[in-house]
Amino acid sequence: MGFRFPVKTKLPPGFINARVLKDSFKRQQAADHEVTVTALKYIARNTALPTRARMEAQLQLAVMPNYTRMTQVRNRCIATGHARSVITDFRLCRTQFREKAKNGELPGVKKGVW
């Protein structure tokens, strides 16, 4: 059985399923290509540069694989792998956040009383 992704990646901590692996791979690739993508976007949007250079930068951006884009990355819960209703500061979905907060496992979080 061959490797599923074009480049080897390290396994993420916490819960692992196929979606978490795919998201982790996309995160790593987006981080690796971040400088290149930023430079190409700057060149493509700079009106002071010649049109040919700008067009070549746009073509290079278009040819890059989808997994190198930050828009492909999805926030996921590190405990369950859920993608919806994730609280970004804790990287937990709402149900896991509620359970861990009730059990006192999240430092600085307590039940609201007013």
UniProtKB/Swiss-Prot annotation:
Alphabetized GO MF terms: structural constituent of ribosome
Record-linked PANTHER family: 30S RIBOSOMAL PROTEIN S14 (PTHR19836), SMALL RIBOSOMAL SUBUNIT PROTEIN US14M (PTHR19836:SF19)
Native organism: Eremothecium gossypii (strain ATCC 10895 / CBS 109.51 / FGSC 9923 / NRRL Y-1056) (Yeast)
Protein keywords: Mitochondrion, Ribonucleoprotein, Ribosomal protein
InterPro entries associated with the record: Ribosomal_uS14, Ribosomal_uS14_CS
GO biological-process terms attached to the record: translation
Protein name, as recorded: Small ribosomal subunit protein uS14m
PROSITE patterns tied to this protein: RIBOSOMAL_S14
Family: Belongs to the universal ribosomal protein uS14 family.
Localization of this protein: Mitochondrion
Superkingdom per UniProt: Eukaryota
GO annotations of cellular component type: mitochondrial small ribosomal subunit
